[in-house]
Amino acid sequence: MDIHDAIHARRSVKLFTDRPIAREQIERLLEAAAQAPNHRMTQPWRFYVLGPEARRAYGAVLGARKAKKVEDPEAARAVVEKVTAAEAALPCEIAVSMVLDASPEIREEDYAATMMGVQNLMLAAHAMGLGTHLKTGAVMDDPRARAAVGVPDGERIVALIQLGEP
């Protein structure tokens, strides 16, 4: 697939088949991500392919955050259950973090490089016939989300990529 075609045709996909993504496909996507430019060759990105338990744990954290906006306790429990189940059902989810440099200038450059890696991964997935959906937001800074995903201190979660066959 021509890169221009991939750029113009790629769309966020929110519904996937339940078919798992092969390890070889994931490795190929991670190799594409690692080709992103990065100043000073810091290679600040880290990719965590979440297994079913990590997806479920992350879903519980996300669901609990969303449930705080719901006044009725029963409805709040339903939100947690729905979000947890939706995350657990994903065929693949990849958490993307970056190593935090002490220098604010380098941190900014590293964030840009990491997100270029995300774009590479998403375009490569599209070229392989896979769909992606990029997730970001305040939940990324939640210590419970970090624990669920397994991101160590010294790294910041910048995105989650949901991946599957459309």
Residue ranges of predicted features:
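Short loop segments at secondary-structure junctions
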Residues: 52-54, 99-100, 165-166
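N-terminal amphipathic, basic helical "cap/leader" segment at the start of enzyme domains
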Residues: 1-89
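A glycine-rich helix N-cap at a beta->alpha junction
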Residues: 149-166
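Short Asp/Glu-rich motifs
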Residues: 25, 52, 144-145, 151-152
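Short coil/turn connectors at secondary-structure junctions
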Residues: 89-92, 130, 153-157
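Residue-level detector of family-conserved "landmark" positions at structurally sensitive sites
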Residues: 43-44, 135, 156
